């Protein structure tokens, strides 16, 4: 327009402005390419594995590791997290290793276990730590409280209600969770409280590693570890002990006596065909005062983190730890009194 109107001075200014903008555009383009090169967002194997894990429930990022390397340190890792149950952990890890090297039936679950022993000795805690180690997250633990299945009419909730009944659309509480998370630890807590029909449903899972839900879908359990916990026999130990009028000879004899009492109660409660399908029946020992002292350090780590989160720092001396262990020790109730002791102690400190 400026050239047509013979306004050459204005046309020259437009030309100079165009050159300036062209130079500036090239400079910005070079800067953008350099920044893009430095901050390039690449989608690699790890990101793809995370997305697949989120969508499918299959822990691909853990499977990508060498299976042997992942399992080599399992026993030591679990023994550091679960105190004074080395024999139980050794049995558990050996059974899992046998299955992972290809010696098990390919349709059988990775492992089927029953954890026996007094309350508060680490049965449920070991299942949680195993879920974190094997599948990389505590969310891989499917926990079902079997006290909710004490009545006959509640048994169908495990695989889903029949057509025409309330809750048919929801699916089974066990089958639906395993269908969504095929790689998981299935924890059936306090199994002795369940109705006997529950054991009949579990027979097929323990043997063939599959179960049919109310929609007719076959749910695959071959990539799960099934753990059942029970306090069976502990009441007899509490009521009768080792005898009247004399103390126990030593701790080894106590543990052997406890195992024999628990084994007798186990055989009375569960059918032989049910027990015969388990890979291992693992008995947990009662905790000693030395074990409680070690557990104090583990429990205090969580307390330290909570205190630091609100802007303070807590230091507990060795004498205080010994005091907490002595106050929180009860051979019949395991580590649970220790948690209450720590809670009451922290409450008293807050009041002061």
Stretch-by-stretch model annotation:
Residues 1-346:
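AAA+ P-loop NTPase nucleotide-binding core of proteostasis motors
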């Amino acid at each position: 327009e400026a050239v047509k109107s013979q306004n050459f001075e204005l046309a020259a200014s437009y030309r100079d402005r165009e050159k300036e903008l062209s130079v500036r555009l090239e400079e910005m383009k070079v800067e953008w390419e350099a920044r893009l090169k430095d901050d390039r967002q690449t989608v690699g194997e790890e990101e793809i594995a995370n997305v697949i894990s989120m969508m499918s429930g299959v822990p691909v990022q853990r499977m990508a590791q060498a299976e042997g390397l992942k399992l080599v340190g399992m026993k030591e890792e679990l023994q550091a997290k679960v105190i004074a149950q080395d024999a139980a952990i050794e049995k558990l890890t050996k059974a899992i290793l046998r299955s992972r090297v290809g010696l098990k039936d390919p349709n059988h679950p990775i492992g089927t276990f029953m954890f026996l022993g007094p309350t508060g000795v680490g049965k449920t805690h070991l299942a949680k730590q195993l879920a974190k180690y094997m599948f990389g997250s505590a969310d891989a633990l499917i926990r079902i409280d079997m006290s909710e299945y004490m009545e006959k009419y509640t048994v169908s909730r495990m695989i889903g209600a029949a057509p025409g009944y309330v809750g048919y659309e929801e699916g089974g509480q066990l089958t639906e969770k395993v269908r969504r998370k095929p790689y998981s630890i299935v924890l059936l807590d306090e199994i002795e409280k369940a109705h006997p029909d529950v054991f009949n449903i579990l027979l097929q899972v323990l043997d063939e590693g599959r179960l049919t839900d109310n929609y007719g879908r076959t749910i695959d359990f071959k990539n799960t570890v099934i753990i059942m916990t029970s306090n069976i026999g502990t009441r007899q130990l509490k009521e009768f002990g080792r005898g009247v009028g004399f103390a126990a000879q030593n701790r080894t004899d106590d543990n052997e006596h406890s195992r024999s009492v628990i084994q007798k109660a186990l055989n009375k409660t569960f059918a032989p065909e049910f027990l015969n399908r388990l890979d291992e029946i693992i008995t947990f020992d009662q905790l000693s005062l030395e074990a409680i002292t070690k557990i104090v350090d583990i429990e205090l780590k969580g307390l330290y983190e909570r205190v630091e989160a609100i802007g303070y720092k807590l230091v507990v001396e060795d004498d205080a730890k010994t005091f907490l262990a002595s106050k929180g020790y009860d051979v019949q109730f395991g580590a649970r009194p220790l948690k209450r002791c720590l809670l009451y102690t922290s409450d008293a400190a807050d009041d002061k």
